[in-house]
């Protein structure tokens, strides 16, 4: 029983982590909408979720030689397989950010994040109800 509960929470924990990382990527795309030569990137959420749930995690240890280097919270970004967003709307300056697509994906990602939070909240509420009798 506890193993099943752990699996449910692990799934949603991984989904929340990936949603958070995707939100950072989408935010970077939106922030760089006017940056000449910027190439919009994303990752396949379903593939990355399956990879984190069903395969052994590979840990990358980075050596910090300066306090200005990336901190620990960014290390998981290196494990994601980011891909360039294919678009037929390339600006004259080489920028490939499509703001309509980015806004829609940002909204969809936010909905996934909120859905996982609501599911976790309801599961905890149900467990508390059962335990109280």
UniProtKB/Swiss-Prot annotation:
Transmembrane segments: none annotated. InterPro entries: Flag_bb_rod_N, Flagellar_basal_body_rod_CS, FlgB. One of its GO terms (cellular component) is bacterial-type flagellum basal body, rod. It is found in: Bacterial flagellum basal body. Keywords: Bacterial flagellum. Pfam families: Flg_bb_rod. Its main location: other. GO terms for biological process: bacterial-type flagellum-dependent cell motility. Signal peptide: none annotated. Belongs to the flagella basal body rod proteins family. The basal body constitutes a major portion of the flagellar organelle and consists of a number of rings mounted on a central rod. In Gram-negative bacteria, at least four rings, L, P, S and M are present, whereas Gram-positive bacteria lack the L and P rings. The rod consists of about 26 subunits of FlgG in the distal portion, and FlgB, FlgC and FlgF build up the proximal portion of the rod with about 6 subunits each. Structural component of flagellum, the bacterial motility apparatus. Part of the rod structure of flagellar basal body. This is Flagellar basal body rod protein FlgB.
């Amino acid at each position: 029983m506890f193993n099943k509960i752990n699996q449910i929470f692990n799934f949603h924990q991984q989904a929340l982590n990936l949603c958070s990382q995707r939100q950072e990527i989408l935010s970077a795309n939106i922030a760089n909408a006017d940056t000449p030569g910027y190439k919009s990137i994303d990752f396949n959420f379903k593939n990355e979720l399956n990879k984190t749930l069903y395969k052994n995690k590979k840990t990358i240890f980075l050596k910090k030689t300066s306090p200005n280097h990336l901190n620990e919270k960014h290390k998981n970004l290196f494990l994601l397989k980011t891909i360039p967003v294919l678009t037929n709307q390339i600006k004259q300056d080489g920028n490939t950010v499509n703001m309509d697509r980015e806004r829609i994906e940002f909204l969809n990602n936010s909905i996934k994040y909120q859905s996982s939070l609501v599911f976790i909240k309801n599961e905890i509420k149900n467990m508390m109800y059962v335990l109280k009798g």
